Amino acid sequence: MKKIFLGLLLAVVSLSAKAQTNEKTDAMDRIELCKKNYAALFGGEALNGEGTDPEIMDILQKYIFGEVFRTGELDIKTREMITCVCLATMQQLPQLKGHAGAAFNVGVTPIELREAIYQCAPIIGFPKVLNAMTVVNEAFTERGIKVPLESQATTTEENRYEKGHEIQYPLYGDRMKEALKDVPGGMGEKVARFLTEVHFGDFQTRSGLDTPTRELLTYCVLTVIGAEPQLHAHLRANLKAGNSPEKVTAAVIQCMPYIGFPAALKALNIIKDETMQ
């Protein structure tokens, strides 16, 4: 009996020691990954204790670059495009300029970054996109990138509705047209047409980013502004476009450090509810 008890005690001690070792390893992995990702993005050293608020910088750098960046299967380019559209949506322009440079450092092309920001326009409005592009263009110029960039438009005045509808209908059907039919003065039909022509015909048809990427970025923008009805519709559209629930979830988690927990949790609960139906 004593031998059995001693054996059990040793097993418990061994498991406890392994657990403590794993915790230390996870902590070290978090720090090492933070430093690696930060260097790739910004070319500097993370966790250096410098500046006026080194404590909060230490917390945010470990959290973002050491934990969020290893949650879900997103490549670093996609993560940085998501960060940029979040910052553009919130009009955090100094941070956007810094992250535009970081995006270039990890392989996002100027066209991809510009298209990511343009994709926000139907959701957040043109003034905010123009503000965002001001600092993004500054980042371009500082890198010796000539602006304006090459056009990525693929539609004409004659076919923008048709081409937009070709993308919109398989993903969303005619729900908006039906929902707006009773708007006073018959103007709901015009608004539904604007949506097809502008959101899908003018933007979604553009080259530079594919439809799954555009839908993923759009979901992130909607997450930032907390547009609950649209989050439901665009989650379904993301799935139809080929983005898995896990990928959309990882994208929302990538937004979390920049937008806070409440807005991200709202979007995560919508993903959960939609995928459980």
Kindly label every feature range from the protein language model:
Residues Q20-I76, V129-T211, K240, P257, ...:
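Acidic, glycine/proline-rich low-complexity segments that act as flexible tails and inter-domain linkers
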Residues M28, E32, P54, L93, ...:
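Electropositive phosphate-/nucleotide-binding environments in soluble metabolic enzymes
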Residues T78-L87, A116-I117, T213-L222, A251-C255:
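Short, structured motif recognition centered on aromatic/hydrophobic residues
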Residues R206-S207, C220-I225:
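Short, glycine/charged-rich beta-strand-loop motifs at protein surfaces that mediate ligand recognition
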